[in-house]
């Protein structure tokens, strides 16, 4: 019996040791999977903890790069003050990353939120819009258009706003307003009147639209009044 028990103890012990080695081997990968799941759920605080722990134990260069992407993305979503620097550091470390266009879009968005419109334009132009998600594409187009408007490039801005007005969702109404505003500012009053009229029932833009509509109706009256006065025909 003893000769049987001893080998059994050895066998059981070897299985326990193997199980421990297997757990130690799989632990980093499990941290990555858990971090990625939390990332997909937009639990950025939780995902950061898991991915930082993963990086401390992993030697897989590809997964570390993906973890770094999720970490800087999380920093951006959390609105960290140094998010743009973290994003730029990522691009410097991984210039050939498949996420480079999205990172450029996020850097541009950080500068946009700060009112740094020239920097925003630069970084938006570094990103290929076709490589972004549909939601990001609309935000990209609107933020680039608004940045162009703020830097005096009205015609370029109008092109982007008009496109969003046609196919947009979240920024559709705002884009209609800015198309109308640009038309008004450039003297295209008939087009501006049409666009502003679409917003007369808008809770957000109704007041501004009615103001500009009134201004447009006043412009021909003022012009006629002036011409009549100049020719002596005004009574």
Question: Can you describe what each PLM-predicted range is?
Answer:
Residues 224-231:
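Conserved small/polar residues in nucleotide/adenosyl-binding loops
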Residues 21-25, 55-64, 91-101, 128-138, ...:
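Short solvent-exposed coil/turn linkers within tandem alpha-helical repeat scaffolds
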Residues 18-52, 56-69, 77, 85, ...:
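N-terminal leader/linker segments that initiate helical-solenoid repeat arrays
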